[in-house]
Amino acid sequence: MIDVQTKQTYSVSKTHPDGIFRIDDFNFLYNCNVYSYDTILFKYAGYDTRGFIDAQLQYYLKLNQPCNFETPSILNHYARYIADCNVLGSLVSLPKHEDIAYDLFERIYVAEKQPGLDFYQNQLLSAFYDIEKNGIQINPTKFTEAFGQSFSVNEDKSYTQYNYYTTTGRPSNRFGGINFAALNKDDGSRDCFVSRFENGSLVELDFNSYHPRLIASLTGYDFGSEDVYEHLAKHYHDTQTPTKPQILQAKESTFRQIYGGISKQYLHVPFFKAAKELAERLWYFAQDHGYIESPVSGRKLILANYQDITLYTLFNYFLQMYETEFNVLTLKPIQDQLQNHKTVAVLYTYDSILFDVPSEELDYLLKEVIPQSIDLNKFPVKIKKGITYSEMKLC
């Protein structure tokens, strides 16, 4: 521990063999501003972290980049030569721990509370922690066939770990050598993920045409009750009855325009005209003020933190930040309604959420929780259900 005013270091311990001042909670610090490098790790260790300030998150919100603090060489040394030891920290002397902590403090400490901290720490970190701790039930044999041995597995569950500190603001999800954000749909590897409940099922909530609809929510554009890409195909091809190939082409063109920049030839389409105006408003605001601000969290994307950024790169960063924060606003009420139930969210992948559901709670999830948590007129969803993650069928 470090007193940020005096820079004095202290050692408190729960299990270290040299610890004199041993603790089981941090109640003695509740009247202080407590900065922790990673509040989620403290939560996994069983500590109450209410009132803590996540220093890593503060750093990220200020600089829009992660703190790349390398694991100290002494811990790497022990990890290499005593690979099966799960108490490596106890092998390092307390004075050395203090040195490591002070080095980290010097690199990461940001005193001023950053815009967006309350939302990111109290809602975003909490929402993804609640998913991580549930794990995904696996068939051990099929899991090993698909992924080999992985330290992500414990008691027939594979655990995930979200990394929030990305350039775009979209959490990545790679843990134990597995990229859970991009599991292959075609090679059978998803077949190892199953329900933890007897006669249970995996249920996937998948947002339709998510980014166009997010842009529509920001601009006031109304797709009505139409499929987004059918709606846009009518404008692309000047027809009220677009063909399936025309709708598919509209989908491909829409992705290119949103992520690569909107071409003049598409500005006759009202949706793209509105999207371009939004991108330009954000860009001009950033040029004048040096940042743009999230309408959800108040987080600032600071222009000086990005080298050679363009109008549409900034627009994409803004859109992915908004997507993530909007998803948290969706996740939290769902998780709140499931608190006293067996159903759990087990995986989040940008525009979809995977649930593990016992048979007796399926109707509750589909007919009560989801409709009460999502405006299905503005954000329609597809619901798929399966015994394994590779056998999902539309409900």
List each model region and its residues.
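Conserved RNase H-like, two-metal-ion catalytic cores of nucleic-acid enzymes
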Residues: 1-73
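Acidic, glycine-rich two-metal-ion catalytic cores of nucleic acid-processing enzymes
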Residues: 2-25, 140-244, 295-338, 342-358, ...
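Helical catalytic core of nucleic-acid polymerases
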Residues: 44-46, 54-112, 124-134, 176-179, ...
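Acidic, low-complexity, intrinsically disordered interaction modules
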Residues: 114-117
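Long, charged/polar-rich coiled-coil alpha-helical scaffolds that serve as structural arms
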Residues: 119, 126, 138-142
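A glycine-rich phosphate-binding loop feature that marks nucleotide/adenosyl-phosphate handling sites
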Residues: 124, 144-146, 256-257, 271-273, ...
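Interdomain boundary/hinge elements
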Residues: 375-384
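Short, low-order "capping/linker" segments at domain edges
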Residues: 390-395
